[in-house]
Amino acid sequence: MVGPEGTKRISKIDTYLNVAEAFAYRSTCIKRKYGAVIVKDDVVISTGYNGSPRGYDNCCDLGVCPRIQLGMHQGEGYGLCRAIHAEQNALLNCSREQTIGADLYLAGINPGDNSIHRAKPCPLCSRLIIQAGIQNVYLRVGAKAGEYEVCLLYTSP
């Protein structure tokens, strides 16, 4: 997680990306861990991480991922994945009225070494984010303060 340098205060963007990163560690996925935070007017209104639907077996508990077994890469075989994406979970936990004009913060973690994974919403999540009225999407792209991007959403593969 990003921390302040010396006596400086951490930026709001890095603060919310830290929250997203913390939620990524709650992920039940063994391929990649993602966390998302939705913020409006400097208030956290929702959080989410990628994992199986409530009440279903988690891949981390089963010790198996169908996409890993088939050698699939990022962006491939989403239909085989049992997880709900972090962005989807965050959006499901609040109303559209709350999300209009809000910002979404997304962080990804590689499970093997806990390094930062350059996260980006998939086409389906992009459409959901647009439909929810989210204003900006911030992506953690590095382990240092200020290492983030504002995402331009895409809606087709």
List PLM regions with ranges:
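Acidic helix/loop or adjacent segment enriched in Glu/Asp that either coordinates divalent metal
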Residues: 70-92
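Short beta-strand scaffold segments in enzyme catalytic cores
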Residues: 34-40, 46-47
